[in-house]
């Protein structure tokens, strides 16, 4: 092939480009032709195409979205801000990791050249969201550049090779069992809200997954409230183990779980993985011992009340407007046939609401954080929930018919 070149060469000249057939990689070799003969040669191997595929914009956007949240926003390791893309046999594999949580997603696509590349994840996702054409072509070149083509638009993103990207942990030899994805999602949703967001309380920043006697129990707590739910699983009843899953991994499992699909859960001493449909998530476990919560949930409640959930949610939202920002305390006053909620703040005023309840004892007062109580009610599934209390100093126990249990610690009774 002959090309006439300007600019980079001092004088207009011709370049001959040859495919070197002897090379299995079909290297491109460039010879600069002068009047005195071949003055030099350049190996263009670094710019050959190493991957190419075409996929619909919607499917590519959904694919990136599934792995995007795992990518760290800031890290001293540049390749971790990238997503690894591998193409082979009309399949694409997207992988992302922050070295604690890793996720991999597989989809079908039209693959023209098998290969791999890593692309800056957030920039790539932002670009795909702005494109309007139905299909997108992605091609990677060994010169650390990826080309994204959509209709008449063409973009080039700096990329990196696969060799620097961490490998996904191997879970093939891990113990495994299956569980309905919607059930798994529901269990994590109804417990993760209670997890501590304070890094100083390390083990409480994760959700406990405990297995014993053929039952899987999921627990989240921050020390002020606790959420627990369990379900039976198809696993040898003699097996037992406790696994503390980072909240980031739990939130990703909730996102990836879909209806009418079985999830496979893999258990290892230091890792746990969940596979749902075409997505696999692997996470390291938090080290440490989860606090023993059995004394709290086994507390005997001398008073058992039925509460209408929606009505109580509405009343709590109203009276919470009158709480002190430093304490957020609402007084629950139980008298025969009635529950009265009271809050007052010197800078705002006072709120007082009431509802009918099936209480027949003497007047009983206890204070709770209304926002913690609202969280619990929002994660209950029944319209009628049961509240168990004993006095002003012991925790309240809230249950429904779905094998869930919630604990909320009382607050000090006082007037602002």
From Swiss-Prot:
Q: From the Swiss-Prot or TrEMBL record, what is one GO molecular function term?
A: DNA binding
Question: What protein is this chain from?
Answer: Beta sliding clamp
Give the chief site where it resides.
Answer: cytoplasm
Q: What does this protein do?
A: Confers DNA tethering and processivity to DNA polymerases and other proteins. Acts as a clamp, forming a ring around DNA (a reaction catalyzed by the clamp-loading complex) which diffuses in an ATP-independent manner freely and bidirectionally along dsDNA. Initially characterized for its ability to contact the catalytic subunit of DNA polymerase III (Pol III), a complex, multichain enzyme responsible for most of the replicative synthesis in bacteria; Pol III exhibits 3'-5' exonuclease proofreading activity.
What family, per the record? Belongs to the beta sliding clamp family.
In terms of PANTHER family, this protein maps to:
BETA SLIDING CLAMP, DNA POLYMERASE III SUBUNIT BETA
Gene that this sequence comes from:
dnaN
Which GO annotations describe the biological process of this protein? Answer: DNA strand elongation involved in DNA replication
Membrane-spanning regions, if any? none
Which SUPFAM superfamilies does the record cross-reference, listed alphabetically?
Answer: DNA clamp (SSF55979)
Top-rank taxon, per record: Bacteria
GO CC, sorted alphabetically, is:
cytoplasm; DNA polymerase III complex
Keyword annotations from UniProtKB, A to Z = Cytoplasm, DNA replication, DNA-binding, DNA-directed DNA polymerase, Nucleotidyltransferase, Transferase
Q: How does it assemble?
A: Forms a ring-shaped head-to-tail homodimer around DNA which binds and tethers DNA polymerases and other proteins to the DNA. The DNA replisome complex has a single clamp-loading complex (3 tau and 1 each of delta, delta', psi and chi subunits) which binds 3 Pol III cores (1 core on the leading strand and 2 on the lagging strand) each with a beta sliding clamp dimer. Additional proteins in the replisome are other copies of gamma, psi and chi, Ssb, DNA helicase and RNA primase.
Where it sits in the cell: the answer is: Cytoplasm
Keyword Translocase present in the record's keywords: the answer is no
């Amino acid at each position: 092939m002959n090309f006439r070149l300007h600019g980079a060469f001092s004088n207009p000249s011709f370049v001959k480009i040859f495919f070197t057939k002897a090379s299995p990689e079909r290297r491109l070799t460039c010879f600069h032709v002068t009047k005195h003969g071949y003055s030099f040669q350049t190996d263009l191997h670094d710019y050959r195409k190493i991957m190419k595929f075409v996929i619909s914009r919607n499917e590519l956007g959904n694919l990136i979205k599934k792995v995007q949240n795992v990518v760290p926003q800031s890290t001293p390791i540049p390749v971790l801000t990238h997503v690894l893309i591998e193409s082979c046999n009309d399949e694409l594999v997207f992988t992302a990791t922050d070295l604690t949580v890793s996720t991999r997603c597989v989809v079908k696509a039209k693959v023209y050249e098998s290969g791999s590349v890593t692309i800056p994840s957030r920039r790539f996702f932002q670009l795909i969201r702005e494109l309007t054409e139905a299909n997108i072509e992605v091609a990677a070149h060994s010169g650390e550049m990826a080309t994204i083509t959509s209709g008449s638009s063409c973009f080039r993103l700096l990329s990196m090779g696969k060799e620097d990207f961490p490998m996904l942990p191997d879970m093939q030899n891990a113990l495994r069992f299956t569980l309905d994805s919607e059930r798994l999602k529901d269990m994590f949703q109804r417990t993760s809200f209670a997890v501590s967001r304070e890094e100083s309380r390390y083990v409480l920043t994760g959700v406990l997954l405990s297995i014993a006697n053929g039952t899987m129990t999921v627990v989240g707590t921050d020390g002020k409230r606790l959420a627990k739910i369990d379900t039976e699983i198809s696993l040898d009843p003699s097996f037992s183990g406790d696994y503390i899953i980072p909240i980031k991994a739990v939130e990703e499992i909730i996102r990836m779980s879909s209806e009418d699909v079985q999830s496979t859960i893999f258990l290892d001493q230091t890792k746990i993985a969940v596979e749902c449909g075409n997505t696999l998530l692997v996470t390291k476990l938090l080290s440490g011992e989860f606090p023993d919560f059995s004394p709290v949930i086994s507390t005997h409640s001398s008073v058992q009340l039925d509460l209408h959930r929606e009505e109580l949610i509405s009343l709590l939202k109203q009276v919470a407007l009158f709480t002190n920002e430093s304490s957020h305390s609402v007084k629950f006053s139980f008298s025969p046939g009635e529950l009265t909620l009271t809050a007052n703040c010197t800078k705002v005023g006072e709120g007082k609401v009431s509802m009918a309840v099936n209480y027949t004892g003497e007047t009983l007062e206890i204070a709770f954080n209304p926002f913690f109580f609202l969280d619990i009610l929002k994660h209950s599934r029944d319209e009628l929930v049961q509240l168990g209390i004993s006095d002003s100093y012991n925790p309240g126990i809230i249950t429904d018919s779905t094998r869930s249990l919630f604990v909320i610690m009382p607050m000090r009774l006082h007037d602002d």
